[in-house]
Swiss-Prot record:
Gene label: rbcL
Residues reported to bind Mg(2+): K191, D193, E194
Protein name in the entry: Ribulose bisphosphate carboxylase large chain
Protein EC: 4.1.1.39
Marked site: Transition state stabilizer: K324
Residue spans crossing the bilayer: none
InterPro entries: RuBisCO, RuBisCo_large_chain_AS, RuBisCO_lsu_C, RuBisCO_lsu_C_sf, RuBisCO_lsu_fd_N, RuBisCO_lsu_N_sf, RuBisCO_lsuI
Catalytic activity as recorded in UniProt: 2 (2R)-3-phosphoglycerate + 2 H(+) = D-ribulose 1,5-bisphosphate + CO2 + H2O; D-ribulose 1,5-bisphosphate + O2 = 2-phosphoglycolate + (2R)-3-phosphoglycerate + 2 H(+)
Length: 465
């Protein structure tokens, strides 16, 4: 058969509704908005083609390989209820299209080119099914939830954190002082802000030294293990690893990375270093909203969360459901489960398009932070459960009496909520009452309750199904 040149419809090759998906396929659910006049099958097939083996015309070299073995296939298309001209296109990719252990390569293939495609008005990657055959090629989180609890000797409750503010402008010594006050008051962790790297007003090495001093002082006073997320994010991978090495030499328990701005390659390198050297790794998701906020275009955060679990991190920010930053309850809980659990059933009501089996990849602790304070504690304890980190930045440092009393207020509120829950009380219904009772015994908590009694951040949720 001679080579037949020319342009042919994608759907002739890449739309295969009778395809049976394999256990080793990577499956993707795309929300496709075709341009007017483009049939959904053609749009779905175009996505499958452009994100796998296809190009815009048939090429002579197609004859030198087996397209059937390597092509992505659009195997199902369904209209999105309540939206006109939006479809969910399901695409199956053969495992051999991807380099083992590389989130970078996976994303370059699946979302690399296709989002600029002219036949589509908009495109969003809603979910990915990562087969065990692929996830087993990743180290995953450096330590995971259980090992972290064992290292810190903290069980049966969420962990408490605080981002040091003002995020930019403090000198290293004053920064360390703020860290010490928070940890002394009863927090488990304090945190570098995501944009604190190594700036003229505070170089990274000075900050690391003063924070380590604060850590050890607070540890000696409280008898509890303390941590400060030292942000190792830097302009080059080598510099990032250098900072992580220095943190390890100081003997601190945890470092931090901005995984989207730093990039998956850097993040995976750091995760490997952290496992090899006994450091926990806290992950911040700066830049995520650029990618995930639009309903019809981009990548949903649940995909970025799955990618992080593969690349590696022990904590990741995941919205609060109640604070100042976005997060719809069911959907947020959907990807919180994807981060923590071994096996997650498909559940479209929570935005989970595929059953995901992580086999034994360690879990990641979700971090709730952003505009939360003591009155939110019952809701947060109920929504996130024990395996989470609750971070109060302004909710600690904004306390009228200072950082340490702010930390005391949060710790008392948390312990009261955990105790009430363990006694079988309903946090959703009696939450305010529980906090009020506890504040009778803690003047610090009473003062915090007074300051924030009226604060609410209420807007319509953007992320609905």
């Amino acid at each position: 058969v001679g080579f037949k040149a020319g342009v042919k419809d994608y759907k002739l090759t890449y739309y295969t509704p009778d395809y049976e998906t394999k256990d080793t396929d990577i499956l993707a659910a795309f929300r496709v908005t075709p341009q007017p006049g483009v049939p959904p099958e053609e749009a779905g097939a175009a996505v499958a083609a452009e994100s796998s083996t296809g190009t815009w015309t048939t090429v002579w070299t197609d004859g030198l390989t087996s397209l059937d073995r390597y092509k992505g296939r659009c195997y199902d298309i369904e209209p999105v209820a309540g939206e006109e001209n939006q479809y969910i296109a399901y695409v199956a990719y053969p495992l051999d299209l991807f380099e083992e252990g590389s989130v970078t390569n996976m994303f370059t293939s699946i979302v690399g080119n296709v989002f600029g495609f002219k036949a589509l008005r908009a495109l969003r990657l809603e979910d990915l099914r990562i087969p065990p055959a692929y996830s087993k090629t990743f180290q995953g989180p450096p330590h995971g939830i259980q090992v972290e609890r064992d290292k810190l000797n903290k069980y049966g409750r969420p962990l408490l954190g605080c981002t040091i503010k003002p995020k930019l402008g403090l000198s290293a010594k004053n920064y360390g002082r703020a860290v010490y006050e928070c940890l002394r008051g009863g927090l488990d962790f304090t945190k570098d802000d995501e944009n604190v790297n190594s700036q003229p007003f505070m170089r990274w090495r000075d900050r690391f030294l003063f924070c380590a001093e604060a850590l050890y002082k607070a540890q000696a006073e409280t008898g509890e293990i303390k941590g400060h997320y030292l942000n190792a994010t830097a302009g080059t991978c080598e510099e990032m690893i250098k900072r992580a090495v220095f943190a390890r030499e100081l003997g601190v328990p945890i470092v931090m990375h901005d995984y989207l701005t730093g990039g998956f390659t850097a993040n995976t390198s750091l995760a490997h270093y952290c496992r090899d050297n006994g450091l926990l790794l806290h992950i911040h998701r700066a830049m995520h909203a650029v990618i995930d906020r639009q309903k019809n275009h981009g990548i949903h955060f649940r995909v970025l969360a799955k990618a992080l679990r593969m690349s590696g991190g022990d904590h990741i920010h995941s919205g609060t459901v109640v604070g100042k930053l976005e997060g719809e309850r069911d959907i947020t809980l959907g990807f919180v489960d994807l981060l923590r659990d071994d096996f997650i059933e498909k559940d479209r009501s929570r935005g989970i398009y595929f059953t995901q089996d992580w086999v034994s990849l360690p879990g990641v602790l979700p971090v709730a932070s952003g505009g939360i304070h003591v009155w939110h504690m019952p809701a947060l304890t109920e929504i996130f459960g024990d395996d989470s980190v609750l971070q109060f930045g302004g909710g600690t440092l904004g306390h009228p009496w200072g950082n340490a009393p702010g930390a005391v207020a949060n710790r008392v509120a948390l312990e009261a909520c955990v105790q009430a829950r363990n006694e079988g009380r309903d946090l959703a219904r009696e939450g305010n009452e529980i906090i009020r009772e506890a504040s009778k015994w803690s003047p610090e908590l009473a003062a915090a309750c007074e300051v924030w009694k009226e604060i609410k951040f209420e807007f319509q949720a953007m992320d609905t199904l």
